[in-house]
Each structure stands twice: as C-alpha cells, then as structure tokens.
Amino acid sequence: DNANGSVEVTTNALGDEIVKMLKQSSDFANHLASESSKLQSAVQNLTSSSNSQAASLEETAAALEEITSSMQNVSVKTSDVITQSEEIKNVTGIIGDIADQINLLALNAAIEAARAGEHGRGFAVVADEVRKLAERTQKSLSEIEANTNLLVQSINDMAESIKEQTAGITQINESVAQIDQTTKDNVEIANESAIISSTVSDIANNILE
C-alpha cells in the first residue's frame, strides 16, 4: 500500500508539473501570438508609409528633373543673348567707324568751305550739321555699347547663378535618389519581417493547438 501510495503521489505531482508546463506553454504561446499580431500590424504600417514615401520621393525627383531641364534651357538662351549682344557691339563698332569718317569728312569740308569764303558759306553750314550728326551718333553708340555691356554682365551673372542652382538641385536630386533607395530597402526589410512574424504566429498557433 505504501508503494502504491508513493506512486500515486509521484504520479499526481508529475501530472501537476505537466499541467503547469502546459499552462506556461499556453501562456507563452498566447503572448507570442499577441506580440506577433502587433508586429505584423506595425510591419504593415511601416510598409504602407514606406511605399507612400517612396512614391513622394519619386514625384520630387521628377519635379527636380524638370526644374533642372528648365534651368539648362534658360542657360542656353542666355548664351544666345550674349552672342547676339556681341554681334550688336560689332555692328555699333562699324557704325562708330563710319561716324568717325563722316566727322573727318565734315571737318575737311568745313575747312574747304572756309577757304571758299562767301561762296562756301552754305556748304559750311551743311558740313557743320553733318559734324553734329556724327557726334550725336557717336554719343548714342557709346550709350548703346555701355548698356550692352551692362546687359551682358547681368546675363553672365544670371548664367552663373543658374549654374550654381543647377548644381545644388543636382545634389538634392542625388540625395533624394539615395533616400528613395533606402526607403525601398526598408520596404524589403519590412516584407521580410512580415514573413518572419507570420512564421512566428504560425508556431504560436501550433503550440496552442
């Protein structure tokens, strides 16, 4: 009887331990399943936000590309304007040479008219008017050249500014591309985490079963 009693006590104790272990396993499995569910939810949110961020970054990159393209077009136009300004300066130079020659001819005509005395008085008046016209032409040409120089300088400054801005936008675009790639990498990591979380959840459910 004592032996039977001892076996019964031992069996009961072992049964209690088994029940206790099963309860602990069940509690652990429930906790594991709960945490896995939370992890899956967090991963889904991360994936969704990462995809949205990636889409926004791609839109930003596209907009920056358009801005860069527009700036490059403006830079080309400014180069064209500078070329045309140089052509204007060349033309004003030619006109200036002609005005110098006219002024010299008017001076010679005035000298000849003075030598002619009374007979050359009318011619002298015409020569003086021609000289004044040549002087006004020279003055206007000087103003045109000065304004053209200012225009060219302003365009050069603008072109340099556009160049710097384009370089800055290019750097920003490169940074956006890097962030976009990092975001895509995060999405891949999140997807892998979701797979792991699902596997853990399955294990927890198997324990509960």
Locate the predicted segments by residue.
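Core structural elements
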Residues: 35, 172-173
